[in-house]
A protein has these predicted regions:
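FMN-binding flavodoxin-like domain, especially the glycine-rich phosphate-binding loop
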Residues: 3-4, 14-17, 21-38, 48-141
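Aromatic-flanked redox-active Cys/Sec active sites in thiol-based oxidoreductases
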Residues: 8-12
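Helix-turn-helix
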Residues: 41
Length: 141
């Protein structure tokens, strides 16, 4: 059974809802998965995981949350190696450019990004289903 951490930061609860759906999808595919706030996760825990999903909403000028999420993300990039990674998050304006930049950053670091997913504002039923599919995809990667 693979072990997957779904690490997220949320400001309004939208990304938390997405994280829970990703974890449920991974569990449905037979993985052991847990959604965990970024403040409760460290790069030291990456070694215990077979795959990791990271969730962060767009902040400010289409960027990652700088105080809690980004430092953990930066630390994890150096230890993920070729473990499958998924990226997800919500946004309220713009077109989701932060996700394009985030994916480029991950790939430039040599990470194996299996997929990305964005939702505008609160995830609707379609977005929640897509999050579940993302979790299943990560579990099967």
């Amino acid at each position: 059974m693979s072990k997957i951490a779904v690490v997220y930061w949320t400001g309004t609860g939208n990304t938390e809802e997405m994280a829970n759906a990703v974890a449920q999808g991974a569990e449905a595919a037979g993985a052991e998965a847990k959604a965990v706030l970024v403040s409760d996760f460290s790069a030291d825990e990456v070694g215990d995981c077979d795959a990791v999903a990271f969730g962060c909403p767009a902040m400010g000028a289409e960027e990652l949350e700088p105080d809690e999420f980004e430092p953990v993300w930066e630390a994890c990039k150096g230890v993920l190696g070729q473990k499958p990674v998924a990226l997800f998050g919500s946004y309220g304006w713009g077109g989701g450019e932060w996700m394009d930049s985030w994916k480029e950053d991950a790939e430039a670091a040599g990470l194996k990004v299996v997929d990305v997913l964005i939702a505008n504002e609160a995830p609707d039923e379609e977005a929640v289903e897509a999050c579940g599919a993302l979790g299943r995809q990560l579990a099967e990667a």
